[in-house]
Structure formats: C-alpha cells, structure tokens
C-alpha cells in the first residue's frame, strides 16, 4: 500500500507538471506575428473549429484568446529586463506596425509676414551668441533680457535731441515708446494667428462694437434691462419725461373653472349659433356705403360726358362764371350727393356728404 501511494503521488506530481507546461506551451500550425512595441499579436491560423462550434462558440473564442495572449506573454519574458524602483521592467522594442491616425496630418503652418518678406529678399537668419562684451561694466553680459549689455534703461542721463521739445520728459517718452512697440508686436502676433486660422479680420474704418441699433432695438433693450432686477422692474425709478413702455407683457386671464355657468352657457350657444347659421353675416353700413359710392361714380361719369358735349357746342366758359338753372343736384350741400361750387373745366365732384367718397373740391386755375 505504501508503494502504491508513493507511485500515486509521483504520478499526480507528473500530471500537475504536465498541466502547468500545457498552460504555458501553446502549439500553433503557423507562428504568430508579434509587434512587441505595440503589444500586438496577429494570428494567421484559420479558425476552422469555430464554424461548427454551435453553442460552445463563446468558449472556443475565449480559449483562442487565452492561447494567443499566452504566446504574447511568452515573448515578453524573452525581452531584456531592468529594475526600476524595486520593480522588474521589460524594455520594449520600437513598434513596427503603423497604426492609423485618428485625425488627419496637420498642415504646415503658413509663413508670417516677416518670413514672407525675408524669403522674398533672401534674408537668412544668423545665429548670434547669447553673451556679448559690455564695455561699461567690463564683463560678459546677456544680449537681451534682464541684466543685458548696453541697457539704456539704467542710464541716468539722456541727451535731448535738437528737434525735440526741451521741456519734454525723455524718460517718460522712452517708456511710452516701448509700450507702443510691445502693443504693435502683440497686434502683429494676433494678426498672424488670425491669418493662420483663416479668420476674417474686421476693417478699421466703419467698425462698430455693437453695430447700428434702431430706435426699436434700443427701446427693447432698455425695457429688458429695466425688468432684469430682483423686483422685475417694479421699484425701478423712471426719468422725468419717460413714457410708459408699450407692449409690455401682461398676464393672461383665464375664466374660472367653477363660476358663472349662465355666462358660459350663453357664450357656447352664441358660438354654436354662428357656426350653424347658413346666412353669412352682412355689414349693413359697409354695404350701404359701397352702393352710394357706385351711384356717385355713375352720376359723375354722366356729368363728365355732358360737360364735354357742352364745351363742343358753346365754347369754354370763363373761370369766374356760374351756371344758372342747373339741376338741384349741382349746387349747395346735400348728404351723400354731389355738389359744391364749380370753376372752369368739368364740374367738380365736391361738397360735403356723409357716407360717400370725397373725390374733389375747389380746383385751381
């Protein structure tokens, strides 16, 4: 029994060792292609067993992914290692697979105005040393910046030019000139950035920050500003001659849900009566005025024809003559008729009337 137990233990140990080797060792018909720089493993073996896997397809995919990952890890253990802060790190080689970009390749930055001018004139940049010899201090100093050589800001005496005002402060003038140069350089930098991004720059002439606003727009803006307070403009003071805003918001008043049922019934019945009435509603006043206008126009046309016939027979009358024995409708005042004083030419369609169309009056010579 003891011999069998020892044999069983040895057999079990061999099986465990074989299982460990089986987990680490993976056999493939075609070797995988590795790109250790990108931690990439490409399997060129056709997945023949996945076509007829059926319900075990998910398990087959997991087993295949596990085997390929094991092969990739086996390759990583063969790389040279180094210890960094008590940790063992493998040094990856350069990647060999070119991965696609998420965004397009950036375009070359356009040249600035100075670069364009330098290329046109053939000016090439010359490298200058950062240190130069300062004759005043007798030591090497920086060419630019803090503690530079020939620093004019440290001078205690400035010579006044011959064409300058002797009472002008040359120190303040130099500081102002430097501020202007800095502002000009900043403006040129912003212009170069705008040209690089193809932005439309506003013209210097006719540039308005807020644009031209009409009277209505200004009034609307003022009204909105007044009601933008915590009290919604209720305690906002007004100017002495300020007019009340027109078209201000008003609360909608709805009819109560429970209240005067008689008024609600009356309004509903009136609406049904209007909808069910077959005869259209006629405006009597408008129809009467229209009929009177048509009659006046017909009568005026007849009188115009009669006046033209009288001109051919009797000649033209003087400007101050008045007709006698005319029809009663040609003189005086009447309601809704034609009348009034008449001058030379065709009879005037004038006079005072109610409900008619005012078509004339006294005519000039």
Swiss-Prot record:
**Any one of the GO BP annotations:** endonucleolytic cleavage in ITS1 to separate SSU-rRNA from 5.8S rRNA and LSU-rRNA from tricistronic rRNA transcript (SSU-rRNA, 5.8S rRNA, LSU-rRNA)
Q: Which residues form a coiled coil?
A: none
Which superkingdom? Eukaryota
Ranges of Basic and acidic residues composition bias in the record:
235-245
- Provide GO CC annotations from the record: condensed nuclear chromosome; nucleolus; preribosome, large subunit precursor
Cited Pfam families: RRS1 (PF04939)
UniProtKB keywords = Acetylation, Citrullination, Isopeptide bond, Nucleus, Phosphoprotein, Ribosome biogenesis, Ubl conjugation
Q: Which residues carry this modification: N-acetylmethionine?
A: 1
Task: State where composition is biased (Basic residues).
Answer: 302-325, 351-365
**Sequence position, cross-link Glycyl lysine isopeptide (Lys-Gly) (interchain with G-Cter in SUMO2):** 154, 226, 266
Compartments reported by the entry: Nucleus, Nucleolus
Please list the GO terms describing molecular function. 5S rRNA binding
Keyword check for Nucleotide-binding: no
Tell me where in this chain the PTM Citrulline is found.
Answer: 273
Q: How is it modified after translation?
A: Citrullinated by PADI4.
Region: Disordered, residue numbers: 202-221, 229-254, 273-365
- Residue numbers carrying Phosphoserine: 5
Q: Give the UniProt family note.
A: Belongs to the RRS1 family.
What is the purpose of this protein? Involved in ribosomal large subunit assembly. May regulate the localization of the 5S RNP/5S ribonucleoprotein particle to the nucleolus.
Q: How does it assemble?
A: Component of a hexameric 5S RNP precursor complex, composed of 5S RNA, RRS1, RPF2/BXDC1, RPL5, RPL11 and HEATR3; this complex acts as a precursor for ribosome assembly.
UniProt name for this protein: Ribosome biogenesis regulatory protein homolog
Could you tell me the gene encoding this protein?
Answer: RRS1
